[in-house]
From Swiss-Prot:
Oligomer and partners: Homohexamer. Forms an RuvA(8)-RuvB(12)-Holliday junction (HJ) complex. HJ DNA is sandwiched between 2 RuvA tetramers; dsDNA enters through RuvA and exits via RuvB. An RuvB hexamer assembles on each DNA strand where it exits the tetramer. Each RuvB hexamer is contacted by two RuvA subunits (via domain III) on 2 adjacent RuvB subunits; this complex drives branch migration. In the full resolvosome a probable DNA-RuvA(4)-RuvB(12)-RuvC(2) complex forms which resolves the HJ.
Name the UniProt record assigns to this protein: Holliday junction branch migration complex subunit RuvB
Binding site for ATP: 21-22, 63, 66-68, 172, 182, 219
Region of interest called Head domain (RuvB-H), as start-end residue ranges on this chain: 256-343
GO CC, alphabetical: cytoplasm; Holliday junction resolvase complex
Residues covered by region (Small ATPAse domain (RuvB-S)): 183-253
Gene that specifies this protein: ruvB
Length: 343
């Protein structure tokens, strides 16, 4: 049986009231400075020429603002915004219905674009390149090909698994944008802004404490902020301070690095059962009773970013920092130092 959805997961959850906290413009958007500066140029250039902006691909870990940036692009271009996701577009007719209902220069956002049906993807190619749909009408000897012209539009794709995109699809995006984990300083700004929108009093130390445990991810920061607010309100605390945030997050089993019970189970399994590794991801997924995708997309990226774990050709290994976080010594003969640049 799998555990309930952990508080730290960067995946969007149905109950997340993210909409009210989302920035409405590039000026309000915190972090991703290089991507933001480049997007501002592309938006202004498209607007000044009266053209649709080039097709754009956002890739990177979940929860970093891909959907929000897509909405901001549409808003700053002054055009319509349609959103869907790869798994929802089951057949070519679904895609045709979306594309033929677009107004000139509209933005079509496809989340999880790496999960598009291959048949649908083939139909998308001429739509992106030639602004046309090539559809087969009828069956058997009576079947005929029909080309439907489309208005100029901007396709924005988002993926957490860029490597799963086919080369023909990836190459059709003129603007590839990688989104990276946020710094603590950037997340502190996200928390402070979110608290202000909630009408929650928070001091700098309290915001910093939440930011420090947010896994470099704004979506996680927003979720932790809402849970800290719950504790603060019940305790009748006028202002969220560092001790209040620390006490709330400790009760939620989110440690000083932002790791929770799932992360610690992952690290402990590698340490205790496999003596620090290497161990394959399929073995870890089976031992944790979690899908492989959850391990690779949710658990591992931040642990690797922190230098706690190394992903090698032979499997996953604990680094020295991983052993230190578990407050243990690596066993004699372990391969720990090989992946830290230490002997």
């Amino acid at each position: 049986m799998t555990d309930p959805i952990p508080l730290h997961t960067p995946d969007r959850q149905p109950e997340d009231p993210d909409v009210a906290l989302r920035p409405k413009s590039l000026a309000e958007f915190v972090g991703q400075a290089a991507a933001k500066d480049n997007l501002a140029v592309f938006i202004e250039a498209a607007r000044s020429r009266g053209e649709a902006m080039d097709h754009t691909l956002f890739f990177g870990p979940p929860g970093l603002g891909k959907t929000t940036l897509a909405q901001i692009i549409a808003r700053e271009l002054g055009v319509g915004f349609r959103a869907t996701s790869g798994p929802v577009i089951a057949k070519a007719g679904d895609l045709a219905a979306l594309l033929t209902n677009l107004e000139p220069h509209d933005v079509l956002f496809i989340d999880e674009i790496h999960r598009l049906n291959p048949v649908v993807e083939e139909v998308l190619y001429p739509a992106m390149e030639d602004r046309a749909l090539d559809l087969i009408i009828g069956e058997g000897p009576a079947a005929r090909s029909v080309r439907i012209d489309l208005p100029p539009f901007t396709l924005i794709g988002a993926t957490t698994r860029q490597g799963l995109l086919t080369t023909p699809l990836r190459d059709r995006f003129g603007i590839p944008v990688r989104l990276n984990f946020y710094t603590e300083e950037e997340l502190e700004k996200v928390v402070t802004r979110g608290a202000g929108l909630m009408g929650l009093a928070i001091d700098a130390a309290g915001a910093r404490e939440i930011a420090r445990r947010s896994r470099g991810t704004p979506r996680v920061a927003g979720r932790l902020l809402r849970r800290v607010r719950d504790f603060a309100e019940v305790q009748k605390a006028g202002t969220v301070t560092s001790p209040i945030a620390d006490a709330a997050l400790t009760r939620l089993e989110v440690d000083g690095l932002g790791l929770d019970a799932m992360d610690r189970r992952y690290l402990t399994m590698i340490a205790d059962i496999y003596k620090g590794g290497p161990v394959g991801v399929e073995t870890l997924a089976a031992g944790l009773a979690e899908p492989r995708d959850t391990i690779e997309d949710v658990v591992e990226p931040y642990l690797i970013q922190l230098g706690l774990v190394a992903r090698t050709a032979r499997g996953r290994c604990l680094n020295d920092r991983g052993w230190e976080h578990l407050e243990r010594q690596p066993p004699a003969g372990s391969q720990t130092g090989l992946f830290d640049g230490k002997s």
